[in-house]
Amino acid sequence: MTDPIADYLTRLRNAISAKHRVVEVPASNLKKEITKILFDKGYILNYKFVEDGPQGTIKVALKYDSVNKVNAIKKLIRVSTPGLRKYTGYKDMPRVINGLGIAIISTSKGVMTNKEAAELKIGGEVLCYVY
């Protein structure tokens, strides 16, 4: 697999479109950090790391509106790919849907949202947009 982050986002997208409640994805440290950000920002209901084998899996419980069964995540867009990396400085931090969404940035201080990176005045690789 050449792009595990794109695979992770695609698994989430497919589970959302199929209206699944829980999706299992192969674990990695970067995927754990992205999942933690999605949980902290309220895009997913819950997550759990399960150690089964050398790598383990992450069980992600998706968040749906109780009235009209709409998911909290409208779009997941992969920005930086292995073939074309996208970097940004803290002055040029992307605004996703005029501040309503988040960009997940991989920085020297770890994985964080665009707002957190701008507050710390550090740039990094733009992994994906979530809204």
Curated annotation (Swiss-Prot):
InterPro entries: Ribosomal_uS8 (IPR000630), Ribosomal_uS8_CS (IPR047863), Ribosomal_uS8_sf (IPR035987). The keyword Metal-binding does not apply. Keywords: Ribonucleoprotein, Ribosomal protein, RNA-binding, rRNA-binding. GO terms for biological process: translation. It comes from the Bacteria. One of its GO terms (cellular component) is ribonucleoprotein complex. The keyword tRNA processing does not apply. Disulfide bonds: none annotated. One of its GO terms (molecular function) is structural constituent of ribosome. It holds the Pfam family Ribosomal_S8. Belongs to the universal ribosomal protein uS8 family. Part of the 30S ribosomal subunit. Contacts proteins S5 and S12. One of the primary rRNA binding proteins, it binds directly to 16S rRNA central domain where it helps coordinate assembly of the platform of the 30S subunit. This is Small ribosomal subunit protein uS8. It comes from Phocaeicola vulgatus (strain ATCC 8482 / DSM 1447 / JCM 5826 / CCUG 4940 / NBRC 14291 / NCTC 11154) (Bacteroides vulgatus). The gene is rpsH.
